[in-house]
Amino acid sequence: MFIAMNRFKVVKGEEKAFEQIWSSRRTRLEEMEGFVSFHLLRGPEREDHTLYASHTMWETKASFLAWTTSQQFRDSHKDAGKNKPLYVGHPEFEGFDSVLEQINTTRDAAAEAAL
């Protein structure tokens, strides 16, 4: 599993605009082999910004790298430069290889038992 994250420092008062950009953007992630899931995360508020992170899970790092060179990536990022006034600084990328995974298998069993 590979996790790709970008951290965004969003100017205070621009949170709704930032979230709207993400909710209305066509990412085409589902077209990519190895794509698992995406989350937009809102973090703590600071004096001049609110921290957000885009969190994308991939089956492999190679799957993620294929995304970054794909037409789908170019299409989904084509208007990114228009949003610079929403940010304090530039987005910061972080990539992580999973070295340990724990899955809650009891949740599914409990749900089935309740049926």
Where are these regions (language model features)?
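Coiled-coil-like amphipathic alpha-helices with heptad-repeat character
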Residues: 2, 20-21
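A sequence-composition feature that detects small, non-aromatic residues
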Residues: 4, 17, 53, 62, ...
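Short, well-ordered beta-strand segments in beta-rich or mixed alpha/beta enzyme
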Residues: 2-9, 39-70
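Short secondary-structure boundary micro-motifs
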Residues: 11-12, 23, 28, 39-41, ...
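Short, surface-exposed ligand-recognition loops at beta-strand->loop->(often short) alpha-helix junctions
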Residues: 10-18
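An amphipathic, aromatic/His-enriched active-site/gating alpha helix that lines ligand/cofactor pockets
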Residues: 20, 26-36, 57-94
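Glycine-rich beta-strand-turn "strand-cap" elements at beta-sheet edges
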Residues: 2, 39-48, 78-115
